[in-house]
């Protein structure tokens, strides 16, 4: 893989997450009844950061939950394009405003599986989607409500989101395969 571009460095990522936090507050007329649900793996730490930002702005501590969505894969090939919902703790979503958080939206399949998991847990007041990066190429009619950055990509490129909680650094890069 060859590095094509650095899209966000640490400062730009922090500014982007701060903007998303403000947009969530503005669109929801405050932060009451909001539960942030991060899609594991990188969506969960991003949801925690958004929660911290909202606390700084509104002085309101939000609940942060996670949902584990992953693709069935073996070491050599993809066995299925369908995301698998792994069992995680039940999320109380009843009559709450759910903000689903992920690092990258691509085909929309992961977001769809996460929405299904949330609806299976109860009846939320609403579900909104916040993503750090929207790279296009949707295969389902799913659109993020909050987007950090739109990055037009080819299907041959890889968008790599690195966050300090997992990767020891914060950046978004595009690689050519």
Curated annotation (Swiss-Prot):
Q: What is said about its interaction partners and assembly? A: Homodimer and homohexamer; in equilibrium.
Query: Per its UniProt record, what CDD domains does this chain match?
Result: PRTases_typeI
**Which BP terms from GO are recorded?**
DNA-templated transcription termination
Write out the entry's keywords from A to Z: Glycosyltransferase, RNA-binding, Transcription, Transcription regulation, Transcription termination, Transferase
Q: Which HAMAP family match?
A: PyrR
**Catalytic activity, as annotated:** UMP + diphosphate = 5-phospho-alpha-D-ribose 1-diphosphate + uracil
Q: State a single Pfam family of this protein.
A: Pribosyltran
EC numbers listed for it are 2.4.2.9
Q: What is this protein called?
A: Bifunctional protein PyrR
Stored InterPro entries = PRibTrfase_dom, PRTase-like, PyrR, PyrR_bifunctional
Care to name a GO molecular-function term for this sequence?
Answer: RNA binding
